[in-house]
């Protein structure tokens, strides 16, 4: 097969590991900078062009769309889909998961546990918003933030009111969440491919920081997840419509709670922490799906 890896960063560990996994299974891997793609959108033969050449002959793509280019990245993935190319994560699911509020609403609809979350637009609703999530301490998140950036822990009601008011004054979209104190600055990252959790690790934030992101200095360690956590992680990915995703889970006194579903999860941290390859299952899943599509076409023909 010819597999395209949509990534702006060919030198990244994640990109290199995906290339290696494709090649080790006998496939041709092509790294494509998403932002360098341009499209011919028409009703007869839609196409994608790259560095002056039309991109043809691809069986599948693995989107690694950075949050900062979600709109353009999803357009490129959608164009590949229009050309009949299988996408490991499709454009609709990527866009769905990138909208943090929409993602939580989808989880809510499926009855999947999550921290109590509030969303408002008017400053005069702030006191009720704070009470809605159980009061201070609470977590305030920019909807556009990634990798722990734009996440604030407000220890008191006064601090919470000040931060929320400041964000709203800047016309920033924010959500307010209950603070799960018992998680103690840690979470569980589950790496899901299809309907399986292929690897999981516990991430612990640095001393004095409630955020556990490895990019912010957190550390990871192997962890054994419970059957409930495993089932919840897979259900959360399915709720988004994704195939490959990282699911962040908080362990609370009322059971596991989904914090976030990431459509382009980091690979380096979880592979080096667990010693498990998460890239091979991705390629194996693509092989299965592309073969099934070809078989269906043959039957129809």
From Swiss-Prot:
Residues that hold Mg(2+) 2 according to the record: 260, 262
Keyword Protein biosynthesis: yes
Pfam family name, one: Rimk_N
Family: Belongs to the RimK family.
Cofactor(s), by name: Mg(2+); Mn(2+)
Binding site for ATP: 141, 178-179, 187, 211-213
Chain positions recorded as Mn(2+) 2 binding sites: 260, 262
Organism lineage: Bacteria, Pseudomonadati, Pseudomonadota, Gammaproteobacteria, Alteromonadales
Binding residues for Mg(2+) 1: 248, 260
Cofactor note: Binds 2 magnesium or manganese ions per subunit.
Protein name as it appears in the record: Probable alpha-L-glutamate ligase 1
InterPro entries: ATP-grasp, ATP-grasp_RimK-type, ATP_grasp_subdomain_1, RimK, Rimk_N, Rp_bS6_RimK/Lys_biosynth_LsyX
Species name: Shewanella sp. (strain MR-4)
Any GO MF annotation of the entry: ribosomal S6-glutamic acid ligase activity
Annotated Mn(2+) 1 binding sites: 248, 260
Gene: rimK1
Isomerase found in the keyword field: no
NCBIfam families per the UniProt record, alphabetical: PRK10446.1 (NF007764), rimK_fam (TIGR00768)
PROSITE patterns: ATP_GRASP
Gene Ontology CC annotations of this record: cytoplasm
């Amino acid at each position: 097969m010819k597999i395209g890896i949509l990534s702006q960063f060919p030198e990244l560990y994640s990109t290199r590991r995906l290339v290696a996994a494709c090649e080790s299974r006998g496939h041709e891997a092509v790294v494509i900078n998403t932002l360098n793609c341009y499209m011919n959108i028409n009703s007869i033969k839609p196409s994608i062009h790259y560095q002056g050449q039309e991109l043809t002959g691809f069986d599948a793509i693995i989107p690694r769309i950075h949050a900062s280019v979600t709109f353009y990245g999803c357009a490129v993935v959608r164009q590949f889909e229009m050309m009949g190319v299988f996408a490991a994560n499709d454009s609709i699911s990527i866009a769905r998961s990138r909208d943090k509020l929409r993602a939580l609403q989808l989880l809510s609809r499926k009855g999947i546990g999550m921290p109590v979350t509030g969303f408002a637009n008017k400053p005069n609703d702030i006191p009720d918003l704070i009470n809605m999530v159980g009061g201070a301490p609470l977590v305030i998140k920019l909807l556009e933030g990634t990798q722990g950036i734009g996440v604030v822990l407000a220890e008191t009601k006064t601090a919470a009111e000040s931060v929320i008011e400041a964000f709203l004054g800047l016309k920033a979209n924010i959500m307010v969440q209950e603070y799960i104190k018992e998680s103690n600055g840690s979470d569980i990252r589950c790496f899901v491919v299809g309907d399986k959790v292929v690897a999981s690790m516990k991430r612990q934030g640095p001393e004095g920081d409630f955020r556990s992101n490895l990019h912010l200095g957190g550390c990871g360690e192997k962890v054994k997840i419970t059957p409930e956590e495993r089932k919840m992680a897979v259900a959360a990915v399915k709720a988004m419509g994704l195939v490959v995703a990282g699911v962040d889970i908080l362990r609370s006194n009322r059971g596991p709670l989904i914090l976030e579903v990431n459509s382009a999860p980091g690979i380096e941290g979880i592979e080096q922490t667990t010693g498990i390859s998460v890239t091979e299952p991705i390629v194996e899943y693509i092989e299965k799906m592309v073969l099934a599509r070809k078989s269906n076409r043959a039957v129809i023909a």
